[in-house]
A protein has these predicted regions:
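Beta-strand/loop substructures that line and gate deep hydrophobic ligand-binding cavities in soluble
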Residues: 388-442
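NAD(P)-dependent short-chain dehydrogenase/reductase
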Residues: 146, 153-158, 163-166, 170-201, ...
């Protein structure tokens, strides 16, 4: 199947794209910046530059069988100024309208248009039990979602042959990205608690399930609403307790609503509002959830993060077999090429003439302007599929870096999984955790750019 996708660089889009390519689908992705998208999408795709205020290029619709619409300005990243609210609305309404127009004008083969919507449609409803048949709520987000979904109506009128399932997504739980990732640093330090009185309902879903639901919608679901939430919503009080149990930490004092509103402004409605949704339509459509309890979802996501460990994963698809890529990464001297210059990274010595399990590297670098000596131990070496390096001596209490080279879609999915913990326990994490997280992200973003320059990436005209 040839699928046109928007929002492919987002939390859901990256995982959905991998799932679709893995089963043999071909993707064309509409993106704002083709170079940035190439580095962020862990799957092969043809990328076409597009701005939601302009018509979709006709060539993007060529031989397209289905559309998946995940695009929209983030709602939870900054305070809602009037300009931000306008962008939240316009990116969704105009963008969806343009996509629908493209299907009507240039997409005769399109048989499905899967629309990613949001549970914000329901507004703040207290403990009322809601599902796909429930009425619209009140508030800014409810108005946005209603206007957003209304743009789909021309498809029902002029192309009744096109299936248009609408997935109203709730709070997506993922180890990296989304609401949970924002909560984790403070909870790991045991300085966070419930929000307000904790009675507000949270309709959540595991990332794997929301990806599975979009695939299900693409393949089988008819026109209509699907609730993108797990079968068992919880209150914020229950969520907080389960999160602390899974991490093995204690709860702290609750955050007063007045403080939350002062910090977040109108955006506080996202965390203080209550939405209790049951996925009746989703279950009736035949979808089977992998994670139907919060405990099972959190245990799956958080097991690697206990004991104050932080984890980041970077994935990059390269159009070469692992055998062609491995020699570059197996040579420690090439590390200088893919490390930011300001770190002054220098390899001093290698303990063995040929790299393998047990090899040690000594090098120097600067972190936040401070010089450090570092010794790395190659803990495992399995060419050309995997190697693991760990810090033997250095500034971290723990540093574990797994390099995986996975055959995928005619090339290689390169995955870097980094687990680290700062020294001095919670004091070190509180004092420098955010800065270190930012520095680690910057280092690996630079690494992705340099790897893309050397090995090439997507087909992005």
């Amino acid at each position: 199947m040839h699928i046109l996708m928007t929002g492919a660089t987002g939390l859901i889009g990256r995982e959905l794209g991998k799932a679709l390519v893995a089963r043999g689908d071909t993707l064309t992705c509409l993106v704002r910046d083709t170079d940035a998208a190439r580095r962020r999408m862990p799957f092969p795709a043809t990328c076409i530059a597009w701005d939601h205020t302009r018509p979709v290029p006709a060539e993007a619709m060529r031989e397209v069988d289905a559309v998946v619409n995940l695009a929209g300005e983030p709602v939870a990243d900054t305070r809602w100024s009037e300009s931000k609210k306008a962008l939240i609305l316009d990116s969704r309404v105009q963008g969806t309208r343009r996509l629908v127009e493209a299907v009507l004008e240039h997409g005769p083969r399109v048989g499905a248009f899967v629309h990613g919507s949001a549970t914000g449609f329901h507004g703040d409803r207290g403990s009322e039990r809601l599902d796909a048949s429930s009425t619209k709520g009140t508030g800014f987000l409810a108005d946005v979602v209603a206007a957003w979904e209304a743009q789909l109506q021309p498809l029902a009128t002029r192309r009744p042959d096109v299936r248009v399932p609408v997935v109203r997504t709730g709070i997506v739980l993922a180890r990296q990205g989304g609401a949970l990732a924002e909560m984790l640093p403070m909870f790991q330090l045991s300085v966070a608690g419930r929000l307000g009185d904790g009675r507000q309902w949270m309709s959540w879903i595991h990332l794997d399930d929301i990806v599975g639901l979009f695939v299900h919608a693409l393949d089988t679901a008819p026109f209509g609403i699907l609730e993108g939430v797990a079968p068992r919503p919880v209150t914020n009080r229950e969520f907080t307790a389960a999160l602390c149990r899974s991490l093995g930490v204690i709860q702290n004092l609750p955050a007063p609503p007045l403080v939350i509103r002062a910090l977040f402004g109108e955006r506080a409605a996202i965390v203080l509002g209550s939405t209790r949704i049951e996925p009746a339509a989703t279950r009736a459509s035949g979808y089977s959830f992998r994670f139907d309890t919060l405990e099972s979802a959190l245990d799956d996501l958080l097991a690697p993060l206990r004991g104050g460990v932080r984890q980041r994963i970077w994935e990059q698809w390269l159009p070469h077999p692992a055998e062609a890529i491995w020699p570059f990464f197996g040579d420690a001297n090439n590390l200088e090429e893919i490390t930011p210059p300001n770190l002054n990274f220098r390899v001093l010595r290698t303990s063995t003439p040929v790299v393998g399990a047990g090899t040690r590297f000594d090098y120097t670098l600067r972190l936040n302007g401070v010089p450090f000596g570092w010794q790395t131990l190659i803990a495992s070496w399995d060419p050309p599929r995997r190697f693991v390096d760990t810090q033997a001596k250095g500034p971290y209490a723990l540093w574990h870096h797994a390099h995986d080279f996975v055959p995928f879609a005619g090339g290689t999915l390169m995955r870097d999984t980094v687990r680290y913990r700062l020294p001095a326990g919670w004091v070190g994490a509180l004092a420098g955790g955010c800065k270190v997280d930012s520095e680690v992200t910057r280092i690996f973003d630079y690494r992705a750019r340099k790897i893309d320059e050397r090995f090439g990436g997507q087909s992005c005209p």
